């Protein structure tokens, strides 16, 4: 398979995120904002350290940025600051829904997200889809409709979570030649700066449990930095619509955990809907034109 490493990176990232609720639930007695604060601040510190040890990369990318056209510079800045903003919104709403609504509701958000990402990639990036892929998208929409039919509140929360991440994926698609890890570092640091003014006002009592800080450290490294970098790596050559559909892996893993580990109730309607969504993932990738045509590096497009 062409671009096997990029497919593998995307699959690994979304599988890791599927287990997020397993790590997050032990922190359920902490406010969503507190978890978000410490997660982002911890990630920002680690990313700042990494930038310090990669000053040569920083200098190279600074020279690259100065050599770009005005339009491309604005594109890089939008990826940096817009990406940081969308990530912050996505993280907050996801944590809030997991700890205050249900794990299934958070999983549902990442069933809606692939549909939104695919449609946005088609509308904004003009990514062409085959008839078979549109059929797969329609099948996924029907599955989401079945799941959300009697759960309107869950559906609304899910759309907010999904839209924030779908927009993040779409705006990261174009490759301006910048170092992906450096871009991610800037996004996380910007997210921390966005949250910093709110910390003194909205924070709760300073956590005293050692387990809290160990869990946050684990989340910062293995559930934030690693999967986000894998995601950006995959976006170097895979289309946003392809990444969006592979994102279905996250809610499928989360759904299995919700039923088996958290013992949340499930009915035949949900099983049918999730089965339709699994089938849509298979069909979308089966009808992917990249399986039959040579891949074109995105770095050569738009240059």
What is each stretch, according to the model?
Residues 1-38, 50, 85, 93, ...:
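Glycine-/small-residue-enriched transmembrane alpha-helix faces in small-molecule transporters
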Residues 16, 42-46, 109-123, 190-194, ...:
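Alpha-helical transmembrane segments of compact multi-pass small-molecule transporters, enriched
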Residues 40, 144, 151, 212, ...:
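C-terminal-most transmembrane helix of multi-pass membrane proteins
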Residues 44-72, 139-153, 190-211, 256-266, ...:
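Membrane-interface helix-cap regions at the ends of transmembrane helices
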Residues 47, 120, 124, 129-148, ...:
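Hydrophobic transmembrane alpha-helices of multi-pass small-molecule transport proteins
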Residues 11-19, 23, 79-100, 146, ...:
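Hydrophobic alpha-helical transmembrane segments of multi-pass membrane transport proteins
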Residues 94-96, 112-134, 147, 252-271:
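C-terminal transmembrane-helix exit sites in multi-pass transporters
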Residues 31-89, 116-117, 164-167, 185-202, ...:
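Transmembrane alpha-helices of multi-pass small-molecule transport proteins
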